[in-house]
Amino acid sequence: MLGQLVGGLIGGHHDSKKVKGTVVMMKKNALDFTDLAGSLTDKIFEALGQKVSFQLISSVQSDPANGLQGKHSNPAYLENFLLTLTPLAAGETAFGVTFDWNEEFGVPGAFVIKNMHINEFFLKSLTLEDVPNHGKVHFVCNSWVYPSFRYKSDRIFFANQPYLPSETPELLRKYRENELVTLRGDGTGKREAWDRIYDYDVYNDLGNPDQGKENVRTTLGGSADYPYPRRGRTGRPPTRTDPKSESRIPLILSLDIYVPRDERFGHLKMSDFLTYALKSIVQFILPELHALFDGTPNEFDSFEDVLRLYEGGIKLPQGPLFKALTDAIPLEMIRELLRTDGEGILRFPTPLVIKDSKTAWRTDEEFAREMLAGVNPVIISRLEEFPPKSKLDPELYGNQNSTITAEHIEGKLDGLTIDEAINSNKLFILNHHDVLIPYLRRINTTTTKTYASRTLLFLQDNGSLKPLAIELSLPHPDGDQFGVTSKVYTPSDQGVEGSIWQLAKAYVAVNDSGVHQLISHWLNTHAVIEPFVIATNRQLSVLHPIHKLLYPHFRDTMNINALARQILINAGGVLESTVFPSKFAMEMSAVVYKDWVFPDQALPADLVKRGVAVEDSSSPHGVRLLIDDYPYAVDGLEIWSAIKSWVTDYCSFYYGSNEEILKDNELQAWWKEVREVGHGDKKNEPWWAEMETPQELIDSCTTIIWIASALHAAVNFGQYPYAGYLPNRPTVSRKFMPEPGTPEYEELKKNPDKAFLKTITAQLQTLLGVSLIEILSRHTTDEIYLGQRESPEWTKDKEPLAAFERFGNKLTDIEKQIMQRNGNNILTNRTGPVNAPYTLLFPTSEGGLTGKGIPNSVSI
């Protein structure tokens, strides 16, 4: 320290040299366009001497005037700013910058930037080309920098050399600590657009009590009855009528909902997102206009009526010339509108499930196959006792055990008895009974009329599943304590019995669609990841190796979740309008969260818990599947193992002992906050890792990355391919099963297709739902996929870079294996009767509606 003090006092006497650098930045923009007026005012400020300055911070030379922290260099400024032409289209611009440097200053470890212009800009990076005795120093920034008067403290960026807290150069430690203090905020005040503060709140902003009782919604989180993961705090004032509810912003300002500035969509993604929405709105409105002149404006009269949503449209020119022209257009929105992938304008794209055959979706084989390779392949479980038993409290709900009997399924088990089939791991169940029964009575007071379902299936010798029976249950009319009334349906393909069987499968699909959207998709990926995003930014410095590991897997998550709270999962939002639980949807997801267990989100643990795999140390991934041809599980285990190998290599480079884990104060604070605040309603659960060993860190990070990337991809990007044709996965049922002797039963006999369509999702709901899932199923053009990074220089450490390259190569190998499996005719579940190859866990993709690709994060 004495040497540093002396150096700081005498350093100015040494000859100064120049170090040149390159700054890459993007000016303020509106979608695809640069804000030209803002650019002009910035040039005026520049001419008046109000510039953008950079000061390097030494990691070896202290400054007595600055509390012996790292010494600052003289300010340097963007070169030729006034002479650089402002591009019309939003994009990156590189500027030179030259710093004074002397030998005592040594290696810069950080820099301070001050923006004296009037507008913000996006700072991508600063690269110092040749620091004497050191070489290139790279700073990955990727942050919006607002005018300095917007900040209470300096904006600081660190070089790409990771450090554990105890290894941080002493002169940089205070800067590291202060930056985290800034990001945490003080928990007060309304957040503004330029804020960078990450904080927590409960879901108290879904309702709007100021607009009447029908818009009141239960607060999710902070109670034993309705526990929930926390969301990002906005600090908006409370509503007038309920001080515990947060007020909402007007719908027209939805895109302005607060998230920390660097969590907002980039301009390319925002352009794509709005373009997809625009196209879907047009596709939604036109059929509605046609319906005004239809005798049954809110009904599809036939399956041909439904198919007209997809066929036709305005086809754009094809070929290399037109593609070259559109690729040359600098504006992303126009490029997306003129896509040349075969989609027509003004019509929905044909969903994959009906591309090859318009009727194969109705087969029992396809109905069962989608439980293994569809959009919700995470529910099916092995049947371990017959008949199935309920776990609901009998004091509250009476006898909820299944009424399926041996007579319903015997004779369909390829010569096996029920006990033999169970012991041979041949019987499986899709069980939505216990999840729905507590809410079903209330749900059926709305326009929804549906059941809680159990579906039994038999694993055949060819690897495919055969439905055996469907049980549909309603709460007992005399009260919950009396249990349920149930009816069991068995397969038939003839006459009215065949039509009833098709309806029974539709009720199962309605159940599965709602559980998928609320639980498998929203709760188990979007909602549970957000606390990890917040805690990582609050407790792990950008210098921390684990921050660098996890950061790509949090991209855009807070923004898409905030938009969901604003327009999708709110009272009267799109989700309530299109899924069967209606206004009870989010409350129901909170009850399900009571049973959420973080370690069980690991794919091997999930498969074992559902009984579709058993632990087996001799198997490649530590588990052996009991359904060999289970596309989601087979591909998923390959992806899981690749992620775990990568995380193991990475974490092992930084942590070699339990002691290093325990003494890492940032890591311990991060994990404590995840447990006690972010997922605070489950803080006392015994299954949380103690974070005392490198293996606990590896397991936890692997699970976080799996949830954010592959699990989300598996349950999201198949939405349009499988549910874009609503008869295959209806989201609502409006009528109960027709009973003999009723007009509905007679219609079912005379016109079964029309009776089917009058039972499931109505025309308006169908169009709204299809419009939504088309948007959610598309990849934006700036997507970053598993095994990719936004910057190749995300870390300076060579061993992690080499491990990451191995990870990418492994994913490429997995892609080849997936293609080989899809081409294997013996694996019938890979494509099924609809001839739809399973590609949802294929790591990479192009932009658009592709049905493949694993983005790094929950980004849509």
Curated annotation (Swiss-Prot):
<keyword id="KW-0276">Fatty acid metabolism</keyword>
<dbReference type="Pfam" id="PF00305">
    <property type="entry name" value="Lipoxygenase"/>
</dbReference>
<keyword id="KW-0479">Metal-binding</keyword>
<dbReference type="InterPro" id="IPR013819">
    <property type="entry name" value="LipOase_C"/>
</dbReference>
<dbReference type="InterPro" id="IPR036392">
    <property type="entry name" value="PLAT/LH2_dom_sf"/>
</dbReference>
<feature type="binding site">
    <location>
        <position position="716"/>
    </location>
    <ligand>
        <name>Fe cation</name>
    </ligand>
</feature>
<dbReference type="Pfam" id="PF01477">
    <property type="entry name" value="PLAT"/>
</dbReference>
<dbReference type="GO" id="GO:0031408">
    <property type="term" value="P:oxylipin biosynthetic process"/>
</dbReference>
<dbReference type="GO" id="GO:0016702">
    <property type="term" value="F:oxidoreductase activity, acting on single donors with incorporation of molecular oxygen, incorporation of two atoms of oxygen"/>
</dbReference>
<feature type="binding site">
    <location>
        <position position="860"/>
    </location>
    <ligand>
        <name>Fe cation</name>
    </ligand>
</feature>
<protein>
    <recommendedName>
        <fullName>Linoleate 9S-lipoxygenase A</fullName>
        <ecNumber>1.13.11.58</ecNumber>
    </recommendedName>
</protein>
<feature type="binding site">
    <location>
        <position position="712"/>
    </location>
    <ligand>
        <name>Fe cation</name>
    </ligand>
</feature>
<dbReference type="InterPro" id="IPR036226">
    <property type="entry name" value="LipOase_C_sf"/>
</dbReference>
<dbReference type="GO" id="GO:1990136">
    <property type="term" value="F:linoleate 9S-lipoxygenase activity"/>
</dbReference>
<dbReference type="GO" id="GO:0006633">
    <property type="term" value="P:fatty acid biosynthetic process"/>
</dbReference>
<feature type="domain" description="PLAT">
    <location>
        <begin position="29"/>
        <end position="159"/>
    </location>
</feature>
<feature type="domain" description="Lipoxygenase">
    <location>
        <begin position="162"/>
        <end position="860"/>
    </location>
</feature>
<dbReference type="GO" id="GO:0046872">
    <property type="term" value="F:metal ion binding"/>
</dbReference>
<dbReference type="InterPro" id="IPR020833">
    <property type="entry name" value="LipOase_Fe_BS"/>
</dbReference>
<feature type="binding site">
    <location>
        <position position="521"/>
    </location>
    <ligand>
        <name>Fe cation</name>
    </ligand>
</feature>
<dbReference type="InterPro" id="IPR001246">
    <property type="entry name" value="LipOase_plant"/>
</dbReference>
<keyword id="KW-0963">Cytoplasm</keyword>
<keyword id="KW-0443">Lipid metabolism</keyword>
<dbReference type="GO" id="GO:0034440">
    <property type="term" value="P:lipid oxidation"/>
</dbReference>
<dbReference type="InterPro" id="IPR020834">
    <property type="entry name" value="LipOase_CS"/>
</dbReference>
<dbReference type="InterPro" id="IPR042057">
    <property type="entry name" value="Lipoxy_PLAT/LH2"/>
</dbReference>
<comment type="pathway">
    <text>Lipid metabolism; oxylipin biosynthesis.</text>
</comment>
<keyword id="KW-0925">Oxylipin biosynthesis</keyword>
<dbReference type="InterPro" id="IPR027433">
    <property type="entry name" value="Lipoxygenase_dom_3"/>
</dbReference>
<dbReference type="GO" id="GO:0005737">
    <property type="term" value="C:cytoplasm"/>
</dbReference>
<keyword id="KW-0560">Oxidoreductase</keyword>
<dbReference type="InterPro" id="IPR001024">
    <property type="entry name" value="PLAT/LH2_dom"/>
</dbReference>
<feature type="binding site">
    <location>
        <position position="526"/>
    </location>
    <ligand>
        <name>Fe cation</name>
    </ligand>
</feature>
<keyword id="KW-0223">Dioxygenase</keyword>
<keyword id="KW-0275">Fatty acid biosynthesis</keyword>
<comment type="subunit">
    <text>Monomer.</text>
</comment>
<keyword id="KW-0408">Iron</keyword>
<comment type="similarity">
    <text>Belongs to the lipoxygenase family.</text>
</comment>
<feature type="region of interest" description="Disordered">
    <location>
        <begin position="209"/>
        <end position="246"/>
    </location>
</feature>
<dbReference type="InterPro" id="IPR000907">
    <property type="entry name" value="LipOase"/>
</dbReference>
<keyword id="KW-0444">Lipid biosynthesis</keyword>
<comment type="function">
    <text>Plant lipoxygenase may be involved in a number of diverse aspects of plant physiology including growth and development, pest resistance, and senescence or responses to wounding. It catalyzes the hydroperoxidation of lipids containing a cis,cis-1,4-pentadiene structure.</text>
</comment>
